[in-house]
UniProtKB/Swiss-Prot annotation:
Metabolic or biological pathway, per its Swiss-Prot or TrEMBL entry: Carbohydrate metabolism; tricarboxylic acid cycle; succinate from succinyl-CoA (ligase route): step 1/1
Keywords: ATP-binding, Ligase, Magnesium, Metal-binding, Nucleotide-binding, Tricarboxylic acid cycle
Cofactor: Mg(2+)
UniProt xrefs under SUPFAM superfamilies: Glutathione synthetase ATP-binding domain-like, Succinyl-CoA synthetase domains
Cofactor: how and how many bound: Binds 1 Mg(2+) ion per subunit.
Gene: sucC
Protein name, as recorded: Succinate--CoA ligase [ADP-forming] subunit beta
Top-level lineage group: Bacteria
Pfam families: ATP-grasp_2 (PF08442), Ligase_CoA (PF00549)
NCBIfam families associated with the record: PRK00696.1, sucCoAbeta
UniProt keyword annotation of Phosphoprotein present: no
Oligomeric form and interacting partners: Heterotetramer of two alpha and two beta subunits.
Binding sites annotated in the UniProt record for ATP: 46, 53-55, 99, 102, 107
Organism: Hahella chejuensis (strain KCTC 2396)
Lineage of origin: Bacteria, Pseudomonadati, Pseudomonadota, Gammaproteobacteria, Oceanospirillales
Record EC number: 6.2.1.5
Length: 388
């Protein structure tokens, strides 16, 4: 689960990390009042969305008057911000962050991620702050420093000092960096994070370290024991179909094609998308109904798929193991009748009672094509989507 920048900075502040004084505002008047509370003659205003690239898209601005703050708020609040990380519709801006201006002398990068390869929290630091760290990793990987955290002993001060010395920090800055490093490590572990980034971690003209930006991603599987973090969830930043799917424990990701896919099992779902692509089609979604492909879940899955106006045909690919294919076929037939599916539906059943399931589909009288194999299913659904 992603957090907004202002939420991440609240967590940083709770752990004693240096962040700018700021307020998340929902109106232009509130934003101007925030500037008065902060004081000073310059402020930074930032549109709050779950996406990077805000600065290039005009969603971050340095302002010198309350009139500029008002204009920025009126421009973005209630509107969508489109960045290179969003789709063409962008994401809605419901709040803007108004915060104090910071004098910057140098920009660094500091982040942490749960590395599945080592099964450890891995911290990364670089002198190349303020830019996309992915580009740094690709073009100059030697500029990324790493520290692997042993889960038995936790983050250690010496690891912070090693990174700080490699970044070229002076003695006072090494102490500050160590405090930030240990604070972030504790935050990461306490709150079950999957990723955090401070980009940039700046050195001010006064020589102090300051967390100018904050990105936090929480492990969704751990939200049951993180009630405070769970309450920070902003559903407006999610695709409505994905949010609806989550309520039914369906794994759904919207894509840009015209062939809806409904599959049981994530691996089979990815393979299904691959073979559709191989035969010239374009998947409209990833949808894993899981092991319990009941009529109710299949019905909801159809509703979600058909809510996408781009979908011209649907491919259902089910492997029957414990759940018999004839029962799955009953569920598909019932779902198609209940939802009133008007577009072609291609179904491939394999496994327990697959032949009986295919016969039920063929005898249903509905616009359902029973495929004999996965290749046949892919060919059939691509032709159906093309109107052939």
């Amino acid at each position: 689960m992603n957090l907004h920048e202002y939420q991440a900075k609240q967590l940083f502040a709770d752990y004693g990390l240096p962040v700018s004084k700021g307020f998340a505002c929902e109106s232009a008047q509130e934003a101007m009042s925030a500037a008065d509370s902060i004081g000073g003659s310059q402020w930074v205003v930032k549109a709050q969305v779950h996406a990077g690239g805000r600065g290039k898209a005009g969603g971050v601005k340095l302002v010198s008057s309350k009139e500029e703050i008002k204009a920025f708020a009126e421009k973005w609040l209630g509107h969508n911000l489109v960045t290179y990380q969003t789709d063409e519709k962008g994401q809605p801006v419901n709040k803007i962050l108004v915060e104090s201006c910071t004098d910057i002398d140098q920009e660094l990068y500091l982040g942490a991620v749960m590395d599945r390869g080592t099964r450890r929290i891995v911290f990364m630091a670089s002198t190349e702050g303020g830019v996309e760290i992915e580009k740094v990793a690709e073009e100059t990987p030697e500029k990324i420093l790493k520290a692997v955290i042993d889960p038995l002993v936790g983050a250690q001060p010496y690891q912070a000092r090693e990174l700080a010395f490699a970044l070229g920090l002076n003695s006072d800055q090494v102490k500050q960096f160590t405090k930030i490093f240990l604070g972030l490590a504790k935050l990461f572990q306490d709150l079950d994070l999957a990723l955090l980034e401070v980009n940039p971690l700046v050195i001010t003209k006064g020589g102090n370290l300051h967390c100018l930006d904050a990105k936090v991603v929480v492990d969704g599987n751990a939200l049951y024991r993180q009630p405070r973090i769970r309450d920070m969830h902003d559903p407006s930043q999610e695709d409505p179909r994905e949010a609806h799917a989550a309520k039914w424990e369906l794994n759904y990701v919207a894509l840009e094609g015209n062939i809806g896919c409904m599959v049981n099992g994530a691996g089979l779902a990815m393979g299904t998308m691959d073979i559709v692509k191989l035969h010239g089609g374009a998947p409209a979604n990833f949808l894993d109904v899981g092991g319990g492909a009941t009529k109710e879940r299949v019905t909801e899955a159809f509703k979600i798929i058909l809510s996408d106006d781009n979908v011209k045909a649907v491919l259902v690919n089910i492997f029957g193991g414990i759940v018999r294919c004839d029962l799955i076929a009953d569920g598909i037939i019932g779902a198609v009748e209940e939802v009133g599916v008007k577009i072609p539906v291609v179904v491939r059943l394999e496994g327990n009672n697959a032949e009986l399931g295919a016969k039920k589909l063929a005898d249903s009288g509905l616009n359902i094509i029973a495929a004999e194999s996965l290749t046949h299913a892919a060919e059939a659904v691509v032709k159906a989507a093309e109107g052939k």
